[in-house]
Amino acid sequence: MNTAYRVWDGEQMHYWDDEGLSLIIKSNGDWTLKRLYTDVLVPVVDSTNRNAALMWGAKVRGKFIYDRSIVKITSDDKESSDVCEVKFSDGVFQVDVSKISADYDVTAVGWVEYATIEVIGDVYQNPELLEGVK
């Protein structure tokens, strides 16, 4: 079984399905991302790197979404849209939908039935997408 994850090494994002990657997690929670080079696993980054981040993902509506993803949510009538940061909280991926919904402030990503959700980036590689967003 493959579990979707991505790792930010401070400069580049590495995804679970990148060729040759192997994620090793110790019982104490420490982790190391390694890449296979000529039959040898070579460390790429690990949890001791202060710029590194390990993020788990889930497939929602056919697209992988991760903690700290940036999404554009557009109402079904296409009259309003909002750019939001996805946060993993209480076991679910959540977004603030208060600007496009009178009924909800924060909702689980899978429950956004009245709108289209498009992953447009993440806070590591595209922080400018959140400029001006409250």
UniProtKB/Swiss-Prot annotation:
InterPro entries assigned: YopX_protein
Which domain of life, per UniProt?
Bacteria
Partners and quaternary state?
Homodimer.
Q: What is this protein called?
A: SPbeta prophage-derived uncharacterized protein YopX
